[in-house]
Amino acid sequence: MAQVWLSGDNADAMLEALTPTDVAGIAEGRVRYSMFLNETGGVLDDLMIARLDGMLQLVVNAGRADHDIAHLEAYLADGVDMTVRRERALLALQGPAAPDVLARLGVDLDGFFFMQVGHFDIAGIPCIITRSGY
């Protein structure tokens, strides 16, 4: 998976032009599943869109990351800053025991529900956790 962060006054509108998603309607701390569309409405790839710290944080598929990033760059709007976070790792911890595993590491997910995103510390390491999946 690759992580791309978008910020700026036109970030919502730019991403709304590339996906069928009400990006402006994604509240702070929330995540939505979406897909990139081509000019005729065909699906190019799927992605996750999160709003955290006032910016859009995208997770795109590893196998198509270069294509997805190029697609974003081709349609990059004025007033939008795009940062590809290649220095960040993504770990998918999935399944019904995932909250228990994180609890053993001191992470309390009580009140943290499906399709939310937030900041947590795991063993003293600052992390961003989404409670999502598809």
Predicted stretch roles:
Residues 1-134:
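Basic, glycine/lysine-rich polyanion-binding surfaces/domains
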